[in-house]
């Protein structure tokens, strides 16, 4: 990965699980990403970080607005932020459906650091 590019890339983590919001940013910062964590989709939408976000790591099942609902809302608003979904739901039919709707990747918890970093690298890679 081009480390200069990664330093300009804000990765937003949206997950209602506090342990995910604490651990993922630490990992991603080690690899040069700027990271902001949010406890809900609504919190992310209300932040000033939409413009800077280059990749969204998004839990599927959250109270209030779900991850899929947030993806649809961003698409409705014309925000083409690449999404990497993460989920504890092992339903294998989810992944192809999410990829069909524009997600970069769907990772099942627990996932490897390598798989997550590969998905983010793919999401932030310049076209």
Report the location of each language-model feature.
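A Lys-centered signature of the CheY-like receiver
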Residues: 109
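Receiver (REC) domain active-site loop signature in two-component systems and cognate sites
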Residues: 62
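Two-component/phosphorelay signaling modules centered on CheY-like receiver
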Residues: 18-36, 101
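Non-catalytic signal-transmission and effector/linker regions of two-component phosphorelay proteins
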Residues: 1-12, 18-25, 46, 75, ...
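Acidic catalytic/metal-coordinating carboxylates
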Residues: 39-40, 66-70
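Alpha4 helix (beta4-alpha4-beta5 surface) of REC/receiver domains from two-component response regulators
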Residues: 69, 90-105
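Acidic, metal-coordinating helix/loop segments flanking the phosphotransfer/catalytic sites
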Residues: 37-55
